[in-house]
Amino acid sequence: MKYDVSVVGFGDNVVDIYTHENVQYPGGNCVNLAVYAKMFGAKRCAYMGYFGTDKNADHVISALREEQIELVKCKKIEGENGYSRCTLEDGDRVFLDYNEGGVRSRHIYDLDEFDLEYLAEFDLVHSGNYCYMESQLPKIKAAELP
């Protein structure tokens, strides 16, 4: 079933590396929103943000493409993609190490008029706590984005 709603996750993407299983999962709050919205039938789902240039970035990009998430406003920045190393203890995820978002923490996405026009095409624009987008919130508010 398709729902007449469009969503964009603007901000974080990471790879969760589960050390006890030697397996990696793409994620991040904004990536997860786009993927789950698509799974539940949203008509248009996008992710907008920065990726690094390493294998972790390639893993997230590949997974998003497989899920048919729109990536047209993403950019690659030379360097390490966001990651966290974690394990499970008694069924709970325990974080061991992370790189503070990789390139995203050092290169803040600076929204221009074209980015704001793109975001205005969506019914919902989502960002999260670890996105390093706080400086962009006044622009989003001024543009009256949903």
Protein language model annotation of sequence segments:
Residues 1-4, 115-117, 139-142:
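Short amphipathic alpha-helices and their capping/turn segments at secondary-structure boundaries
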Residues 124-146:
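Conserved beta-alpha-beta core of the PfkB/ribokinase-like small-molecule kinase fold
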Residues 24-28, 113:
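Short, conserved loop/turn and helix-capping segments at secondary-structure boundaries
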Residues 29-39, 143-144:
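Histidine-anchored nucleotide/phosphate-binding helix
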Residues 28-29, 56:
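Conserved alpha-helical elements of sugar-nucleotide-dependent glycosyltransferases
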Residues 1-24:
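Positively charged, low-complexity intrinsically disordered leader regions
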Residues 22-25, 61-63, 139-142:
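Short, glycine/charged-enriched secondary-structure capping and boundary segments
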